[in-house]
Amino acid sequence: MANNVDLSIDFCGVKFKNPFLLSSSPVSNSAEMVAKSFDAGWGGVVFKTLNSDRLPIVHPSPRMACIDYGAKKGVAVQNVEMISDRPLKDNLTDFLYLKKNYP
C-alpha cells in the first residue's frame, strides 16, 4: 500500500522533506553518519557549533553529579558536546560533500 502523505515543511524559509531532523549530537558528527541518515529518510540535520581551531575544547569532568532534593535523589549528566572538536577543515569538507550529494 503506497502512502503519499506530504510531510514537507518550510521553516524560516528552508524547505525540509519532513520535520524529522538529527540533533546536534554524536550521530551528526561526520558526513558519513549524516549521509546514512539522509539515505534512511531523515529530513535534515543540526550540526554542532564549529570551532575555529584556535579555541581549546575542554570537556568537563566529572560528567555526572548526584542531586539530593529532600528525600529524593537523582543523577544529572552534563552536556559535554556543545561544540565540535573536529578540525574546521574536516567539517567544511563534510558540508561540501553533503551539499553536493544531498542538495
Predicted regions and their residues:
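Active-site entrance/lid segments in N-terminal catalytic domains of soluble metabolic enzymes
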Residues: 2-103
